[in-house]
């Protein structure tokens, strides 16, 4: 059995809810950034390719290249971190494109790793049980997706698809995992619902006014007799 902890169970759950919310914010900001890049460079490509003489333009258009750098482009000898054809750049930044997929995969791996290595052991200590007694179907699915992303080049094999309890219908067998906006939103909601289920179980709520699977978001409010622990002062 885990060593007893001075942490309250609901405090640890709240920390994970806050962490999920941070990832939701990062995901939405990233999508906005990709969309902005796509719109801005689409206009620039059209301006670069438009005809500037009376002769008909090439049917395929002039080849254009995107030069990207974190440094000031007006300065000489800057280092370009990316040189890519404009069509490939636009394809990567389109809705559902490679950049969105890469970001979605990173977030899901981050969500599972923080749960498995940090939150789950602390929940177990707060409850006085072993970590493997803290179980959640959505976390099992995230573990499977993490392993597919890291070890199978994101290709979903039949045996792994069969092991998905909640997210199986989101993906096709023997194809690369593809995360849509709607799919990511569903995963975020399922994570919040799981946090609610953990709280209901800890509080002993069996017949509440709502069920965890009916919730879309979760917030924990501490009463006047129960204040959150303040952060330690910086040295």
Give a label for each model feature:
Residues 115-127, 150-157, 199-206:
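Long, hydrophobic, amphipathic alpha-helical segments used as structural scaffolds
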Residues 100-120, 139, 143, 147-150:
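Short, hydrophobic, well-ordered secondary-structure elements
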Residues 1-102, 133-137, 144, 161-235:
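Extended intrinsically disordered or low-complexity regions, especially N/C-terminal cytosolic tails and loops
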Residues 68-73, 106, 110, 151-158:
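Amphipathic, heptad-repeat alpha-helices with coiled-coil/zipper character that mediate oligomerization
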Residues 124-164:
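Short, mixed-charge amphipathic alpha-helical segments
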Residues 76-91, 109-125:
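A short mid-domain helix/strand-loop element embedded in enzyme catalytic domains
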